[in-house]
Amino acid sequence: MKTLLRASLVLFLSLTLLTGVAYPLLVTGLGQVLFPAQAAGSLLFRDGRPIGSSLIGQPFGAARYIWGRPSATAPTPNNAQASGGSNLGPSNPVLLQAVEARIAALRAADPGNTLPIPVDLVTASASGLDPEISLAGARYQAARVARARGLSEAEVLALIDQHARGRWFGFLGEPRVNVLALNLTLDGRRP
């Protein structure tokens, strides 16, 4: 009995040290050495100060900015502590009302825009924290942003194209734009 108890205790302590201390320290150390920016949260800086992460969406509401995907985190948009989807099905009246309200807000912000509204501008993601939108979503907003900033639409479209990321491995996902990085670049431009 003592032998079994002792062996169990040694195994428990060994595995606790290995999986609870040694492995996390090893992975953290490797991350800091091999991927220092990512291990620090993929932060974006302005004037030497961190202003956000390229991995978490930020709320933008002014006409001069490209707007990201709607956030399902309530009551505060893009709240990482409340990450999660709305879990509303496609026929749920609450979801339909939310989408209709988002469409109305986009139309009101840019009444002359006759382009079809990309779906990612009116639907929240599963996490509610998406930092990126489709190229179509960014291009849809180019005219509004250009007018608000006193830039030409061609300039805004060129910046969108500069920030475009392709599909992963050439075939996974859709081409996309990081909203925070693009808005930081727009802030650096003067009309």
UniProtKB/Swiss-Prot annotation:
Keywords: ATP-binding, Cell inner membrane, Cell membrane, Ion transport, Membrane, Nucleotide-binding, Potassium, Potassium transport, Transmembrane, Transmembrane helix, Transport. It is a single-pass membrane protein. Pfam families: KdpC (PF02669). The keyword Cytoplasm does not apply. The chain crosses the membrane at residues 7-27. One of its GO terms (cellular component) is plasma membrane. Its main location: membrane. One of its GO terms (molecular function) is P-type potassium transmembrane transporter activity. It is found in: Cell inner membrane. HAMAP family: KdpC. Part of the high-affinity ATP-driven potassium transport (or Kdp) system, which catalyzes the hydrolysis of ATP coupled with the electrogenic transport of potassium into the cytoplasm. This subunit acts as a catalytic chaperone that increases the ATP-binding affinity of the ATP-hydrolyzing subunit KdpB by the formation of a transient KdpB/KdpC/ATP ternary complex. The system is composed of three essential subunits: KdpA, KdpB and KdpC. NCBIfam families: kdpC, PRK00315.1. Belongs to the KdpC family. This is Potassium-transporting ATPase KdpC subunit. The lineage of its organism: Bacteria, Pseudomonadati, Pseudomonadota, Betaproteobacteria, Burkholderiales.
